[in-house]
Regions:
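Paired intracellular helix-loop junctions of major facilitator superfamily
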Residues: 115-126
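Juxtamembrane helix-start elements in MFS-like secondary transporters
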Residues: 21-37, 61, 90, 94, ...
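Extracytoplasmic gate region of multi-pass secondary transporters
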Residues: 1-49, 109, 113-116, 140-155
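Hydrophobic core of transmembrane alpha-helices in multi-pass small-molecule transporters
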Residues: 86-107
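Symmetry-related core transmembrane helices of the 12-TM Major Facilitator Superfamily/SLC fold
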Residues: 210-225
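C-terminal ends and interior cores of transmembrane alpha-helices
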Residues: 66-86
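Transmembrane alpha-helical cores of Major Facilitator Superfamily
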Residues: 32-39, 66, 99, 103, ...
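Cytoplasmic membrane-interface "Motif A"-like loop-to-helix N-cap segments
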Residues: 53-66
Length: 225
């Protein structure tokens, strides 16, 4: 599941925390986040491969699935909390959780050949592993597309919900068109979430931090399958 997140990791970090913790999460921070993903991914290959020699391959993959599902499901809660009560604590948790996820992603790559040998014997490892790598490559292409699609749906839903809470007169004055034309305005990039927040009533929480919640839930489901 982690491979689908790799291509959009920088964007995720910026959109989840950029609006709530702008002094901390900027372009340089997001770029360093991607660098750390690579380092933890590489380190996970050595760490989990070594650990699997002691606890067994099956136990190692059980840890991957259980911890992965738990961490993915905890991220939407983190995003929700940082949007309501911005705190660097939530950023630290998100950062740590995703780094653990990517160590397990790297560890999966490193330990899967040995696990396949344990299950099917060394004679069949080559063919099975080749098919598995093909599936991994496919996920690398389709994963970011699926994540982007889910994010766009969440964005559209958030814009529509927020538009309903904005005074129609304020909306028309700000965007030069009535609220019933919102679909056209969104396609033209005239209406965006940040622009809606400018005229939103007090107390409305910016939903930008939660746009990837459905994505994280999908990642957890994929691990469960």
């Amino acid at each position: 599941a982690g491979i689908g997140v790799l291509g959009v990791a920088k964007t995720m970090m910026t959109e989840i925390f950029g609006t709530t913790l702008p002094k901390t999460v900027n372009a340089n921070f997001a770029a360093s986040y991607v660098l750390m993903i690579s380092l933890f991914n590489m380190g996970g290959r050595f760490f989990w491969a070594s650990v699997s020699d002691y606890i067994g391959r099956k136990t190692t993959f059980t840890i991957f699935f259980v911890c992965g599902i738990t961490l993915y499901l905890s991220i939407p809660y983190t995003a929700q909390q940082v949007s309501v009560s911005p705190s660097i604590v939530w950023l630290i948790y998100f950062y740590s959780a995703t780094m653990v996820i990517f160590t397990m992603y790297g560890g999966g790559f490193a330990t899967i050949p040995a696990y396949l040998a344990d299950l099917f014997g060394t004679r069949f490892v080559g063919g099975i592993h080749g098919r598995l790598l093909t599936a991994w490559s496919t996920a690398g292409v389709l994963g970011p597309l699926a994540i982007t699609s889910l994010r766009e749906r969440s964005l559209q839903r958030s814009i529509e919900q927020m538009a309903k809470q904005v005074n129609p007169a304020d909306f028309a004055a700000h965007f030069g068109a009535p609220v019933d034309q919102i679909q056209t305005l969104v396609l033209q990039k005239t209406v965006t979430l940040s622009k809606l927040m400018e005229i939103a009533p007090r107390g409305i929480v910016d939903p930008a931090s939660t746009l990837y919640n459905s994505t994280m839930e999908l990642m957890a489901c994929l691990l469960g399958v």
